[in-house]
């Protein structure tokens, strides 16, 4: 377990604060039961827990976070509207398995972009990804190409999409860290967060149906309609996924007080209960354990004080002063173990030049400070 923190703060006459890392020995490892897992503090991007986060794995329907992101970005650009009517085509429905997640949309049926997004994000309907992808890019293949392009733009190093849905296919994979990068971008969209937090949603009759559709969330952390016993206070979405190849997957976030955590759990198992009465879906239980571990063990702590004198730097070419006092431009916090003594942190100052040249104004950058703990930086 490692904690990484980039504090992008310019200091008054000095300093950009660098990486803060706490070694694994600082806290007891929660030993998450999954192929890969990641826990990140949302505001700072601090990695609180990581397990195999760069491994290339099947990710099932967590793929749909990217599919939805592209649609919301298209809406922002004015290329689509939430109230826009879209008609399902035969090509969009072709090749989807009958036993996959579906909203039972048929060829020629018309729904709005908003309704299709709810189908995608609440019940994980596969056909909606193809329908919206075809609408946006002209073909499903073109939409998949755009998914891969966007992944690269977001900095994903271990991701390749072969379809819009997450159905098992050669060349379709991602990693826990890459899914976090995609999710971090998606949650910037308010409507995305509204949809992934929706417990149930009703779609009125369409041109092809006489009855309304009632959608119930697949996410047992926020809804017990499908699975009972997993509700987590403060949980906010985000996306479930499950295939034989991927196992049980879940990307989620949770809020407690002023803190928000984002978790990714991939390749968890479905374990039979000891009494044989059913199964435990460990993507939910392990995510809940991750959240509890993060909230219980970490809190923001101040690592730099804007009023603190860091050091004095010699000044050349000045008749008025021989040194200049170096202070942080602003205070800086980092997400740290609650029981960590901040005085144990090590600060290393690296000056751009050993001597500052006049004239010097308040707020000028003179170098960099790295805050570290133990033997890691």
Task: List each language-model region with its residue ranges.
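Polar/charged alpha-helical tracts
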Residues: 5, 25, 145, 343-344
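Short alpha-helical segments used as structural interaction elements across diverse proteins
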Residues: 1-2, 61, 283
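Bacterial N-terminal signal peptides that target proteins for export
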Residues: 1-10
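Domain-terminus/edge residues, biased toward the C-terminal soluble/receptor-binding domains
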Residues: 156-160, 168-173, 177-377
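Hydrophobic alpha-helical membrane context
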Residues: 16-17, 76, 290, 298
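Hydrophobic core
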Residues: 11-20
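Active-site-adjacent loops and short helices of periplasmic peptidoglycan-processing enzymes
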Residues: 21-177, 181-190, 195
């Amino acid at each position: 377990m490692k904690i990484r923190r980039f504090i992008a703060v310019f200091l008054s006459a000095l300093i950009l604060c660098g990486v803060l890392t706490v070694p694994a020995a600082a806290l007891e490892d929660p030993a998450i039961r999954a192929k890969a897992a990641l826990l990140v503090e949302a505001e700072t991007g601090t990695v609180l827990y990581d397990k195999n986060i760069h491994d290339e794995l099947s990710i099932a329907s967590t793929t749909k976070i990217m599919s939805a992101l592209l649609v919301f970005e298209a809406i922002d650009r004015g290329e689509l509207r939430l109230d826009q009517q879209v008609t399902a085509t035969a090509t969009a429905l072709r090749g989807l398995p009958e036993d996959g997640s579906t909203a039972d949309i048929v060829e020629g049926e018309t729904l709005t972009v908003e309704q299709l997004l709810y189908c995608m994000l609440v019940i994980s309907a596969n056909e909606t990804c193809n329908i919206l992808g075809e609408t946006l890019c002209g073909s499903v293949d073109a939409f998949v190409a755009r998914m891969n392009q966007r992944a690269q733009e977001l900095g994903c190093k271990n991701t390749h999409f072969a379809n819009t849905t997450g159905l098992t296919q050669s060349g379709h994979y991602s990693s826990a860290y890459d899914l976090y990068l995609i999710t971090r971008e998606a949650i910037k969209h308010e409507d995305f967060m509204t949809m992934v937090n929706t417990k149930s949603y009703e779609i009125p009759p369409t041109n092809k149906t006489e009855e309304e559709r009632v959608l119930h969330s697949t996410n047992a952390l926020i809804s017990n309609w499908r699975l009972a016993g997993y509700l987590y206070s403060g949980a906010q979405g985000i996306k479930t996924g499950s295939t034989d190849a991927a196992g049980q997957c879940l990307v989620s976030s949770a809020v407690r007080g002023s803190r928000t955590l984002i978790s990714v759990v991939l390749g968890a198992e479905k374990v039979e209960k000891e009494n044989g009465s059913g199964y435990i879906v460990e993507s939910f239980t392990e995510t809940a354990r991750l959240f509890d571990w993060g909230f219980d063990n970490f809190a923001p702590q101040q690592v730099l004080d804007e009023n603190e004198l860091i050091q004095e730097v010699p000044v050349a070419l000045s008749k008025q002063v021989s040194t200049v006092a170096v202070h942080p431009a602003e205070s800086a916090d980092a997400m740290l173990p609650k029981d960590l003594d901040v005085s144990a942190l090590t600060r290393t100052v690296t000056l751009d030049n050993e001597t500052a040249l006049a004239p010097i104004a308040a707020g000028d950058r003179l170098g960099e400070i790295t805050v570290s703990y133990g033997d890691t930086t």
